[in-house]
């Protein structure tokens, strides 16, 4: 097994995969967990774990089934001490995975995601009074803020439902907002 002190690259590694129904790499434990989930959630669970195992297997020069990761649903993934940290996120069309020697978090959302961005912004985020709160750029700004907050919570190994109330996101004003 290649541990970090023998690993040449100390920068984060990021992988992006389209969701294609690939579920060919799963441990017995992961199959047991999948059997307890709805069909849709089981498919997402198995495919995301397959990609995570394939990517980390390549990184550490291991058979994907030998990657010693624990990645239970709704919990942060864990690697043994000395193997760094990983975080991953998925939407209905893609999965993104990041690995680094230090704690790290990542989130992905579709730009065309249908959500009540005005309500989300009002509840969780600060905004400039000079911004147009009805446009597509405002919606994208809120989605970017959401990704940043969710990635930070993952970095801290927290739980979104419990920890979002503790997050405050401050953004730099745009040149237009500075006057």
Question: What does each of the following model-derived ranges do?
Answer:
Residues 1-172, 176:
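Core catalytic alpha/beta fold that binds nucleotide/phospho-ligands
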């Amino acid at each position: 097994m290649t541990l970090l002190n023998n690993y040449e690259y100390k920068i984060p590694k990021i992988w992006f995969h389209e969701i294609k129904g690939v579920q060919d790499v799963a441990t017995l434990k992961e199959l047991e967990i999948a059997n307890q989930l709805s069909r849709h959630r089981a498919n997402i669970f198995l495919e995301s774990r397959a990609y995570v195992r394939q990517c980390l297997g390549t990184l550490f020069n291991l058979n994907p089934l030998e990657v010693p990761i624990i990645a239970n649903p709704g919990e942060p993934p864990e690697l043994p001490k000395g193997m760094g940290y990983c975080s991953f996120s998925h939407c209905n069309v893609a999965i993104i995975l990041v690995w680094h020697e230090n704690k790290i978090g990542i989130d992905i959302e579709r730009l065309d995601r249908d959500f009540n961005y005005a309500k989300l912004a009002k509840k969780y985020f600060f905004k400039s009074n000079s911004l147009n709160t009805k446009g597509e750029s405002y919606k994208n700004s809120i989605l970017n803020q959401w990704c940043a907050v969710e990635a930070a919570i993952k970095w801290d190994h927290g739980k979104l439902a419990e920890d979002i109330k503790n997050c405050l996101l401050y953004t730099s004003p745009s040149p237009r907002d500075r006057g």
